[in-house]
């Protein structure tokens, strides 16, 4: 099976497909990291400041699935993800949940250990290796170029960490052939990806593409196999909360509180704590019905801090 590697940086249904397959075919695609190759093992924060944003978030594709028509559903079975041995996490000026509080570029290079199923993020902090594609979707029916950065009902940069091997993603088809693409692979991420990046890592991904005409959807859905939740789910957690009438502000408050906890309990500086929130901590909405306030929690899996206890 040949590995596909041609990329594009916008959604545009006029882009010529790089490959055509029959429904049910298995496809292997080479995914570049979210910087589009601008960052590597030897990069520094200065390289983050110099990023060319026209080159970020490349996706590999598009793949034309024969027979797929608007109104159909494309089933994407994620079969395998194979990483390289490194990844990066950055604080990018102007980007992230607390962008106004973290104005300076910051970079961390992590070691990805596929066989051990772990990511060495910092001294004494080890994350589970749980790879998935952050950006995955099909072409929009609207003409012209569309940014890959915001997600849409056609998929895109959804950053759903449960889209791991064993999960099936269902996408509405908007154009003939679906025009499937994938990119932005991550070695680890917390729900919310609050600093704007995960452990960004180049990988090869293998998927099976099928057409479902018995299923009509208006936005992405996915099926997670039994027992395929994060390995940290069963361990102990420390949880901070944000409470208030604005969901975004509640999320910001919960994140600020976790940054404070990581500093006072484990001695992390603010930048490292913010980045750790992004790659390992999960934001969750606890409560929505008791107006006027929302309750948002941020969950720290304490098992990852074993070397800092």
Describe the function of each predicted region.
Residues 24, 68-71, 166:
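Loop/turn positions that initiate beta-strands
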Residues 34-45, 81-91, 177-187, 286-289:
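Short, Lys/Arg- and Gly-enriched loop/turn segments at beta-strand edges
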Residues 129-133, 137-157, 161-247:
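Conserved mixed alpha/beta catalytic, RNA-binding, or beta-rich assembly cores of soluble enzyme
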Residues 29, 73-76, 171:
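A generic structural signal for residues embedded in beta-strands
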Residues 2-13, 52-60, 146-154:
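Short, structured beta-strand/loop micro-motifs enriched in basic residues and often containing a Trp
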Residues 80-165, 170:
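Intrinsically disordered, low-complexity linker/loop segments enriched in Gly/Pro
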């Amino acid at each position: 099976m040949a590995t596909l590697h041609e990329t594009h940086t916008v959604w545009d249904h006029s882009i010529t497909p790089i490959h055509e397959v029959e429904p049910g075919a298995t496809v292997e695609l080479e995914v570049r990291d979210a910087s589009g190759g601008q960052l590597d093992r030897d990069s520094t924060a200065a390289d983050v400041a110099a990023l060319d944003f026209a080159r970020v978030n490349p996706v590999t594709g598009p793949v034309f699935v024969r027979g797929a028509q608007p109104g159909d559903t494309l089933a994407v079975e994620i079969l395998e993800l194979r990483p390289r041995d490194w990844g990066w996490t950055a604080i990018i000026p102007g980007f992230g949940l607390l962008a106004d509080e973290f104005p300076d570029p910051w970079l961390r290079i992590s070691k990805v250990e596929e066989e051990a199923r772990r990511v060495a993020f910092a001294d004494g902090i080890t994350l589970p290796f749980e790879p998935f594609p952050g950006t995955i979707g099909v072409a929009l029916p609207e003409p012209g170029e569309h940014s890959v950065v915001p997600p849409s009902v056609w998929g895109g940069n959804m950053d759903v960490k449960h889209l791991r091997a064993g999960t099936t993603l269902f996408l509405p088809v908007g154009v003939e052939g679906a025009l499937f693409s994938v990119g932005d692979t991550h070695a680890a991420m917390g729900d919310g990806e609050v600093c704007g990046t995960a452990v960004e890592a180049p990988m090869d991904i293998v998927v099976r593409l099928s057409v479902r005409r018995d299923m009509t959807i208006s936005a992405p859905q996915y099926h997670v196999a039994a027992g395929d939740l994060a390995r940290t789910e069963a361990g102990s957690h420390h949880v901070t909360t944000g409470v208030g009438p604005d969901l975004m502000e509640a999320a910001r408050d919960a994140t600020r509180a976790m940054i404070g906890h990581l500093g006072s309990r484990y001695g992390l500086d603010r930048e490292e704590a913010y980045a750790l929130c992004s790659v390992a901590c999960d934001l969750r909405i606890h409560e929505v019905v008791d107006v006027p306030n929302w309750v948002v929690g941020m969950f720290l899996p304490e098992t990852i801090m074993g070397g800092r206890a």
